Amino acid sequence: ELIFRLVYDQAGCRKPIKRLWISSMEESAIREGFENLQPGSDYDNLYHSALCRQRADWLVGLNGTRLFTVLYGGKVLKVGRVQTPTLAMLVEREEKIRNFRKEPYYTAHILAGGMDAATEKIAEKVQAESIAAASEGKTATVVSVTKEKKTVQPPKLYDLTTLQRDANRIFGFTAKQTLEYTQSLYEKKLVTYPRTDSQYLSDDMEDTARNVIGAVYKAILFEEPSGAEPDVRRVMDSKKVTDHHAIIPTMEIAKADLATVPEGEMRILSLAANRLLCATGEKHEYETVRAELDCGGAVFSVSGKSVIRNGWKDFEAALKRSYKTTEDKEKEDRKLPELSEGMVFEGVRTNVTEHFTQPPKHFTEDSLLSAMERAGAEDMGDDVERKGLGTPATRADVIEKLVKDGFVKREKKQMLPTEDGVKLITVLPDVVKSPQLTADWENALTLVAKGEYPMQAFMDGITDLVNGLVQTYHSISDEQKSMFGGGAQEVFGKCPKCGGDVVKGKFGAYCKNKC
């Protein structure tokens, strides 16, 4: 919307405009769009929101980057409305990991009836060994058995962020790669519009969804249909569809030669197709069993799980069998023998195991995207439409900029802040690195797009922030400047023109007075 409006305004055009709004490049979708052109004025608020975002990014980035680069000298310190809070989250996680001190704990175990039952965590090894010794060779009695049936509902359809997360977790793709692959598929008419933040289809798409599911079975067959009718109504809710509906394959997959689709794109297409089957599949049902056994005066517990109906997870498993994935393998479910209160097990064996508390995990691109999406959510009500840092369309570029600028590095699947990244967050004020503040801005931009918040009020807040930064941070010590290679410079002599000090810069010697 913004790109066209900028050209329209700069050209001085005053002709009336109509808006073509489509979510697919299929001929039928384009034809329908042209038959239902919308008045351009219907999208004025969307334009105002995009213009606010552009100007806010420019004001914060331009002034913040120049301010802190000049203050600290040396390396260019890029400050961004979204990228700085994102870097701050990475640095905060790294600090927690570095400061973590692992602590040991112990559990005593009994081996009975093919089961390994354990105590709760025990701080002292001596106590765990004492419990194990008191139970060795004794009789264990089942004192309680708790069974509970549980359900896992099918997942929602993909928006761009959840697609990027799964592609990173399953295939190791970066967020940028996933967006590029999906954009290419969109241009080939094989998937719908990628830059969406909706995980639902509109209510009028029931027939479309059923037809696409049929095409998926024929073109990208993961498993033979189970016989269960797809529940397409579950993925439909016009109230939860924003500018564009969720990402799904199009009917073009039934006509296209999928053998010619590049491997990376085919994997993304398979993800989108598989998610449509999962989202409209049956619920996954299982039963958990927890038993407590008394032995030697101590209580030991053991848990198990058995699947009642695999449901939509059959499709998920089929996808993973189709591709070699980088996803961490899930622990296999442990099924317990049939147990009842009062059952006894004679002559149990015992042992003690040592464990350590675990630090927080490093961010992966999957978990970082999730953190960006959820930033500030805990302080916002459930009725808030947009939460987080950036938009689905911009998050990939934000991550890539941090890597390119040398503030973040990739190590295998982990996203780690560099030394310069840690230093930058250390010196920047909270007001520019707060994920909560940026999430509040994103919420305000959403309200601008809906016509519920004045454009000027948003820009006044951004301008006040930038003015406050420039007025507050105007000088630092040479010691602080040295953090990024700035600070005191060696004097080579006097300037013959003004008598000022001549120092060596990046591109040669120059007068500090810049005469």
Regions picked out by a protein language model, each given a short descriptive name:
Residues E1-E373, G381-K387, A393-F407, K412-Q414, ...:
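Toprim catalytic domain recognition across nucleic-acid enzymes
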Residues Y72, D464-C515:
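Functional cation/ligand-contacting sites centered on basic and imidazole/sulfhydryl donors
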Residues S135, A272-A273, I462-L469:
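Short amphipathic C-terminal alpha-helix that caps PH/PH-like domains
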Residues G137, L447-M455:
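Short loop/turn hinge sites at secondary-structure boundaries
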Residues I170, Q456-D460:
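Intrinsically disordered, low-complexity terminal tails
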Residues A209-E223, G421-K450:
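Short, amphipathic alpha-helical interaction segments positioned at domain boundaries
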Residues K283-H284, D379, M455-Q456, Y473-Q480:
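Short, flexible/disordered secondary-structure transition segments
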